[in-house]
Amino acid sequence: MMLGAVKMEGHEHTDWSTYYGEPECYTSVGNMNTGLGMNSMNTYMSMSGMSTTANMTANSMNMSYVNTGMSPSMTGMSPGTGAMNGMGAGMTAMSTALSPSMSPMTGQPGSMNALTSYTNMNAMSPIYGQSNINRSRDPKTYRRSYTHAKPPYSYISLITMAIQQSPSKMLTLAEIYQWIMDLFPFYRQNQQRWQNSIRHSLSFNDCFLKVPRSPDKPGKGSFWTLHPDSGNMFENGCYLRRQKRFKCEKKMSMKEPGRKGGDGGSANSSSDSCNGNESPHSNSSSGEHKRSLSDMKGSQALSPEHTAPSPVSQGQHLMSQHHSVLAHEAHLKPEHHYSFNHPFSINNLMSSEQQHHKMDLKTYEQVMHYSGYGSPMTGALSMGSMAGKAGLDSASIPDTSYYQGVYSRPIMNSS
C-alpha cells in the first residue's frame, strides 16, 4: 500500500507545493466529487474499470485539497461502484476511505458537466491544459466580409441618393434598382424582398413624385423624382438619419376620396396637384365629386322621411339629452341622492339659509359629539373620517362660499 505518499500533513506544505506546479484549488465538502481531477492512462478524460478495493495513489489521481479540518487525517480515496464517463457524466457513490480517527464519508452523487471537467483538469493537471492550448482552431470565416454587410441606410435614403446622383435628377424604378445593386453588394441577393420595399417607399412618401415619360424620352416605366418643396431632408448631407418627414400640405388639405384608387391616373393627378399645376383629370374628378354631393343633397330634400327624424328617434334623442342633464346635475349636487335623515347630511347641517355662517361651528360640535374620543381634533379632519365611515364623500361639505359661487340660489331651495 502506498497510502503514505498521499498523506497531507500541515508541516509538509512545502513538499506538496513543489509537487504541484500550479496553485492549489480549494473546494467545499459538498462539491468534493466535482473537484476531483481524474488522470487517465489512455483516454482524455475517462476513468475505466478500476477495482473497488484498490486505493488510488498520487500517481493515478490529482486531488484537490479540501479546506476543512480533515486534511491532517485524510489518507486516501477509493472509488465506489461509480464510473466517470468521457465528457462529464454523473459520478455516483464516490466513497472516501479516511483515517481511523474519522468515520468514512460518502460523497454526494453529482454530475460533472463539460465545463467543470475542463476547469478542474486545467487547474490540477497541466498536461491536459497544455494539450488543450496547443489545439489549432479551424480557420473559418465566422463573419461575413465588411463589403457584403447590410448598409446602414434606410430605403428612403437609398432612393434619395440614387436620384440626387443622376444628372437629370430623375430615375426609373429599374434604374434605382440597378444603382443600389451596383453600389451595395448586399442587395444583390433577396432582390424581390427589398425591391418590394423600395416600391412601397416610393408610393407612400410624399417626397417622391412620379413623372410620366415625355414623347421625346420613349421607354418603359415612369420616372421618379424628388419633390421640389421637400428641401434637404437629411442633415448636412448625412443619409444615416432623416432630419424631418416631408408632408405635402396640398395633398393633405384636398383629401380626395379617389386618392387610393391604385391606377396610374390617380397617382399622376395627386402628384400634379401637389406640384400646384392641377391636371384636367383632377379637375374633372373634383367636379364629379361636387356634382355627387349636390345630387345627394337634392335626394335628401325630396325624401322627407330621410331628413325629418321619426317621432321615436326624436323621443330617444330628447331622453338621452334629459339623462345627460340629470347626470350633470347629479355630479354637481351629490347630496341630492341622500334623502335619508343622516346626522351629517346637508339638511341637518344647514337647516336654513340664515345658518350658513354657523356651518363651521355646527360641524365641529356634531363631530365632537359623534366621535367620542375627546381628543382635540379639528373639525375638518374628524369630518373626513366620519364621512368616510358613513359612506359619504368628505368633499360634499366644503366651505359655503363654494356653493354660493356655483348656485345662484341657496342650497336648501335647490334640492
From Swiss-Prot:
SUPFAM superfamilies: Winged helix' DNA-binding domain. Residues 251-262 have a biased composition (Basic and acidic residues). Residues 150-244 bind DNA. Pfam families: Forkhead (PF00250), Forkhead_N (PF08430), HNF_C (PF09354). Disulfide bonds: none annotated. Keywords: Activator, DNA-binding, Nucleus, Transcription, Transcription regulation. This is Hepatocyte nuclear factor 3-beta.
